[in-house]
Structure formats: C-alpha cells, structure tokens
C-alpha cells in the first residue's frame, strides 16, 4: 500500500482535545513530577550498606525511570496513589532488562545478567530478594498485589532470546516479541490495579504489540548508527529494500513504504485496542495511557511522510505531560 494513502487508510488521529484550550490547563502531573524527581544517590551507593530504607529503593526506581523510560514514568504518575510505587518497580525492572543488550560487549555477559534476574525473581517469590533496589521494590509489589510470576519470567526469557543481533524475520515475530515483553508488562499493571477482565487483557495485548512495533521504529536510527537493522525482513523484501538502505538513511519511496507498512500495523493494533473501550472497566484505563505517546509518534511519522530519520522524530514532545493528563481526566485511552 502506498504511503500517500495513509490518511484514508488510518482515518483521523485523535490527539487533539477541542475546547479544553479555553480552560486552565491541569498542572497536577508537572507538580507531581517535580516532587518525585529530586536527585537520588547512584545505584552503587543505594544498593550498598545495610541501612537502605524504603524511600531509598523507591527513589532509585523513580530516577531510573525518569532517565531511561520518561514516557513510562509520566504514565505511572497518573496511576492511583496506592498503585504507583508498584508500577514504578515493575517498569524499573523492565528498564533493567532492556538496557542489558546495549550495555554488554559479549552475549555471554548478557546471558549472565539475565540469569541474575531469573534467580532474583525466584528469590522474590521465596521472600528472599537480593539487596538490590529494583529487586526490593519488585518484591514489595509482588507481595502487595500477588503478581503472576509467569509474566515476569516471560519478559526475561524474551529479552534473553533478543540478545542475538538478528532482524525479525517477519512482522509476526516482532509482534510475538512485543506480546511477551510489552503486553506482559501491561498484564502485570492490570494486576496492580486489581483488574481481572478478559476485554482489558485483549486491549493490553494489542497495546503491547503497538508499543513493541513503535519502539522498533523509533530505535532504528540509533541501531543504524551501530550498523544494526531490526525491521521485519519480509516487509523489506516485499519492497525490495536492503538493510544497507536503512544504514545509509535512504529517502527512496520504497524505504518509506516499508516504514508505512510497519507503522500501519501499530496503528491497527491501537484501533483494535480501542474497540474494547466500552467493555473495559474504567478503572483499567490508566494502565493504557501510553497509547497517547504511541499515537503522537504515529502522527508525527505521518506528517514527515514516513521519513524514519527526520529530525522532528527525535525531539521530545514537551506537551506530552499535558496530553496524558487530559486523556486521564477524560477517562480515555
């Protein structure tokens, strides 16, 4: 499908909020972020010593998220107060796993770190967590909400398999990776919120897949700088595009068509997720606020005609906190 047909294929993107600009913008999210983002000690000093307090481990997770997963940090701020610290712990756990691949020079070292987290999860469920800030906070979350161990292990197992620097063979392989990582994260978030609902699970599955696809697109310039390309090979072959085309940042139409096809799949998952909104408990909506950031990226990539390397796609959206707050206030996702 040609990229120029995006508008008719996707329909309108629901990012604007008519009428709200005349009201005083809600400021609670920024105020909450300022309160929670004060400087904290480094990971080494937080984890060391026997006097590590609850606030120390909690603040370590906050700072890790603020630096490494800012969108997840903002979304977590809008969860109910009683669920917030557990969500921070869960996302910090995900960050710890996600950054292993890019922080090691050898796969063997990465496997050792994954093994550490597998043992950590086992120890958490044996009420014997290691003296590591994220592990301690995750242990508290597991005890507080009786989180399902299987989802945590799925995230580790899938991240471990992804240590191989191989492109996804097809879009289904990328979706499977996203299901086992991002969707699993959302299933656990629903458990933190006390939600047991089949429709909410279906929505979480689609949102997680959309998140995984968008993350793959967003990370392509970074991976390209390290001479890696992970976009689905079947779609690249369909349009006659090689990995070298992405490495040299080609502006050719067939390269943009690859990006269009991949982005369209993310858009389709968002559409499916929203089709459940009338059947899902309103209490579950805060778990799905990341759709705001996903749709923002998809709108931007449409505006630049699917030029994956356009500078505007690398800029942080300064209005994202406001957009998230408004969607939360409207009880939408």
Curated annotation (Swiss-Prot):
Q: Can you tell me which family this protein belongs to?
A: Belongs to the NDUFAF6 family.
The residues forming a coiled coil are none
Q: What is this protein called?
A: NADH dehydrogenase (ubiquinone) complex I, assembly factor 6
Q: Which Pfam families has this protein been placed in?
A: SQS_PSY
* Gene Ontology annotations for the cellular component aspect, listed alphabetically: mitochondrial inner membrane; mitochondrion
Keyword Membrane (UniProt): yes
Tell me a GO biological process for this protein: mitochondrial respiratory chain complex I assembly
Q: Which organism is it from?
A: Bos taurus (Bovine)
Transit peptide range per the UniProt entry: 1-44
Keywords (alphabetical) are: Membrane, Mitochondrion, Mitochondrion inner membrane, Transit peptide
Function in brief: Involved in the assembly of mitochondrial NADH:ubiquinone oxidoreductase complex (complex I) at early stages. May play a role in the biogenesis of complex I subunit MT-ND1.
Q: Which PANTHER family match?
A: NADH DEHYDROGENASE (UBIQUINONE) COMPLEX I, ASSEMBLY FACTOR 6 (PTHR21181:SF13), PTHR21181
Q: What is its main location?
A: mitochondrion
